[in-house]
Amino acid sequence: MAGNTFGQIFTVTTFGESHGAGLGCIIDGCPPGLELSEADIQFDLDRRKPGTSRHVTQRREADQVEILSGVFEGKTTGTPIALLIRNTNQRSKDYGNIATAFRPGHADYTYWHKYGTRDYRGGGRSSARETAARVAAGAVAKKWLKEKFGTEITAYVTQVGEKKIRFEGSEHISQNPFFAANQSQIAELEHYMDGVRKSLDSVGAKLHIEAANVPVGLGEPVFDRLDAEIAYAMMGINAVKGVEIGAGFDSVTQRGSEHGDELTPQGFLSNHSGGILGGISTGQDICVNIAIKPTSSIATPRRSIDIHGNPVELATRGRHDPCVGLRAAPIAEAMLALVLIDHALRHRAQNADVAADTPDISRSDK
């Protein structure tokens, strides 16, 4: 299997399966001298881990990270960083009924055709459990970006199924199980998700991700444009079916006089571009939206076929998220961080000596 490595200078290679002994990643290209501990990484893993509320999978995993290499006396050495997360709560017997049949909406059918074999236990490598390794790597990237530029990356859920969530303040995000920037709608969301779960069905979600204090100049036109790489990173997350940068699809109904962000000596007058022009960061906040499909694993019987092509009916057993988007915020933050650190290092490698005479107006209001 190819395609398990992300990045060009700051590279991350993930490994492991949902019901294997463990999973993890190798980070190569991390600058030396970054103070790093397991606690720095654990914070984001705890935000992502399963079993934290009745609205997510009840699989109980500590997701305790171990740093195996690349850190000495509390600082990165510049050598590869190996991170390991052991699986402790597998329940593989729940998946016996899909050993020879394909779950609708899952990667079972495509993995079988591509590789001629598959680990059917919890989806194996195709499981969203793999994203724990990305969150671990992203925590390292976030720490470096914050110390280097003051970059802050925040994600929150803006819609669950047909329920839109109003933004009331980022301080609310960590105070509820929905990663919602809103406390007044929590009871409504609790009731809604209880109904979804009781109906043996699932729903999708929409998330907003922002990166503040991003330096101007990141991105490598033409094929490695910053927005192109962000879209690539977000689409690599399980269940993501759509990505918007800035105004996104609303750009269709905007006029050019509205969409084009005007510049003044005091700063930009708007940010419909989402902080990226010509594939290069403007220094404004980078704004991304992602759409996540409903969880494919549901207890409602559905039609499918077995490996011989015979018709079957499957009801998925096991412990699953009725809305996988509820745990996606730390994953989306991690992927945006991995894009930004890689491009920051690429920019430094080629353009460290470039100095423009024009003021950086993105900083004029900060």
Swiss-Prot record:
NADP(+) binds at residues 48, 54. Gene3D superfamilies: Chorismate synthase AroC. Pfam families: Chorismate_synt (PF01264). It catalyses: 5-O-(1-carboxyvinyl)-3-phosphoshikimate = chorismate + phosphate. Its EC number is 4.2.3.5. It comes from the Bacteria. This reaction introduces a second double bond into the aromatic ring system. Homotetramer. This is Chorismate synthase. It comes from Neisseria gonorrhoeae (strain NCCP11945). The lineage of its organism: Bacteria, Pseudomonadati, Pseudomonadota, Betaproteobacteria, Neisseriales. The gene is aroC.
